[in-house]
Amino acid sequence: MPKKSKDGSGKIKRNYPDAFIENAGIVVQEKITDTLEKNYMPYAMSVIVSRALPEIDGFKPSHRKLLYTMYKQGLLTGKRTKSANVVGETMKLNPHGDGAIYETMVRLSRGNETLLHPYVDSKGNFGKSYSRDMAYAASRYTEVKLDPICNELFRDIDKDTVDFVPNYDNSTTEPTLFPTTFPTILVNANMGIAVSMASSVCPFNLAEVCETCIAYIKNPDHDIISTLKGPDFPGGGFMLYDEEEIKEIFRTGRGSIK
């Protein structure tokens, strides 16, 4: 930003006197269809890739930044710490408000009961995903550490198993993916709404998913439905089971269940 001089002249001295903004002040007339073609797709891809949808490791960037921060804090083996402490550290990778970061943590916690296999071992009131009346307590009152299952998220992460990139201000680095040892994207449900695209994956039983993956690696013609019967939800429940419908969902990746 321009700074006023200290010599009392009132003139503005700029930090970068040789810098300029290309085409500044020039009004460009073009068809709106051309503008959309040039700008909409890059914007959509940025939202899809960088923010809204889970990657192949099953995590959105906000989840990954939070869990990696907790890993670097030693919360995989150490004792619990205040949630507010984790939220503050996470801002080094995720420059959002503390409320958004804490809400992400709540969803990943055992106390909230959102995930089939929670990633955050929590202590205190984290609310319940199935009740709007049971709100979670403020971050200064709750405590967290990583759940033991996170050992499978970070296994060999310090051995160049995944790529690392600089954070937003180049003060540190963060992983682009987690080297997970099981298909987290199938085990823990994750929803995402992007630009003209959305993702909603049901959670499946961990043992069945691993059994199916091993069988499929050994035999690409393996009948998936013989080992992966259907979704497994954290709150339990009954499903109107239609084998042919499930097969079609497995084949296409599209469909719904009741």
Predicted feature residues:
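Catalytic phosphate-handling regions of large nucleic-acid enzymes and associated NTPases
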Residues: 1-254
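Gly/Lys-enriched N-terminal cap/neck module of very large, oligomeric protein machines
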Residues: 256-258
